[in-house]
Amino acid sequence: MKIMFLGNDTVEIKDGRFFIDGYDAIELAEKFGTPLYVMSEEQIKINYNRYIEAFKRWEEETGKEFIVAYAYKANANLAITRLLAKLGCGADVVSGGELYIAKLSNVPSKKIVFNGNCKTKEEIIMGIEANIRAFNVDSISELILINETAKELGETANVAFRINPNVNPKTHPKISTGLKKNKFGLDVESGIAMKAIKMALEMEYVNVVGVHCHIGSQLTDISPFIEETRKVMDFVVELKEEGIEIEDVNLGGGLGIPYYKDKQIPTQKDLADAIINTMLKYKDKVEMPNLILEPGRSLVATAGYLLGKVHHIKETPVTKWVMIDAGMNDMMRPAMYEAYHHIINCKVKNEKEVVSIAGGLCESSDVFGRDRELDKVEVGDVLAIFDVGAYGISMANNYNARGRPRMVLTSKKGVFLIRERETYADLIAKDIVPPHLL
């Protein structure tokens, strides 16, 4: 199959129509209704295997373990998480709910890491009882709570420490996490991170296993990863000088994807070369650790498409508006981050036109793209919004009392419904009316 769209290996235009994994997108829209999320099983497999292939050198050259811990925040649909678990993928969870899904997905406990800057006691209990690989500790108060909770349970909790390296990830400020001004991590320069680890070593119910770092999301430049890796390994050397040995280095996630189809960005191989080459420079100073990464977007984003049907077209003095039945409640990224997503008409026409694509919500920010060149759009056409497999359905909501959409999985075994559309009854299922209003 010829790759027609950068980053999207399993789609093509055939006989004037858009196909995903060999399935006609227009027919999928007709069968399952719109708006509709379509996830490509084959693309997820391709993306995961690119990580494994790129980082196999780590295990070959160091004899240490390499773990991909999928960031469930990107898309925690149970079919997606089970697919990745079957491939051998671990889990990066940030809530009790995500841990619950990871266990339902049969992810081995020793491949689960628990992130987040405000873990509750209930979540810590869940993690300890699940015997997860590590809590990535974000504060001294959290460390104290983990130790106290483990004591109450009569167990020992494995902990790694999330450090803040003050690295500029060169990404959108709302998804930057590794600068001093960000809320995440323990500061290294001031000595807080070292203090926390030394405190942990004096505690009876925690076991220090590693160092963690995550500097941001949608990084399209390798240099911040190199700086992050260097600063983490410098800290590992400092720990060694204090007589502290660690088993795991977790460098988080963040590798970007090509939302713009005319812009090449770093690959998993580029990331692997940068990280491995940097870490190996320290092999004479410290024993090489197990290596953990937490990709989310780069595993599932390019596997997802949001199909929306055109219901109305409106000409204004400024633009030609195309109104589709998908909205910002279904996919928040353009409204929240002013994010770009490639959009096409699923039916190829002989004529092009410039249009703006919007949803039907009562918000001026409910716009998927402005002044885009598409094949001529008519009422009834189906548009495909690309690269929505991450932070699409996971950020969907019920604004304007709209139900979240269906999701299907395309695979070599067929097309499977993996999330049902919410009904009007679902919208009020958790509401309770007091007796005096009945």
Curated annotation (Swiss-Prot):
Reaction(s) catalysed (UniProt annotation): meso-2,6-diaminopimelate + H(+) = L-lysine + CO2
Which top-level group of life is the source organism from? Archaea
Write out the residues that bind substrate: R297, R333, Y337, E363, Y391
Q: What is its EC number?
A: 4.1.1.20
> SUPFAM superfamilies from the xrefs?
Alanine racemase C-terminal domain-like, PLP-binding barrel
Name the catalytic site residues.
C362 (proton donor)
Q: Does the keyword Lyase apply?
A: yes
| Any single Pfam family the record assigns to this protein | Orn_Arg_deC_N
What this chain does, per the entry, is described as:
Specifically catalyzes the decarboxylation of meso-diaminopimelate (meso-DAP) to L-lysine.
Which family is it part of? Belongs to the Orn/Lys/Arg decarboxylase class-II family. LysA subfamily.
- Name-wise, this protein is Diaminopimelate decarboxylase
Look up and give the organism this protein is from.
Methanocaldococcus jannaschii (strain ATCC 43067 / DSM 2661 / JAL-1 / JCM 10045 / NBRC 100440)
Q: Supply the gene name.
A: lysA
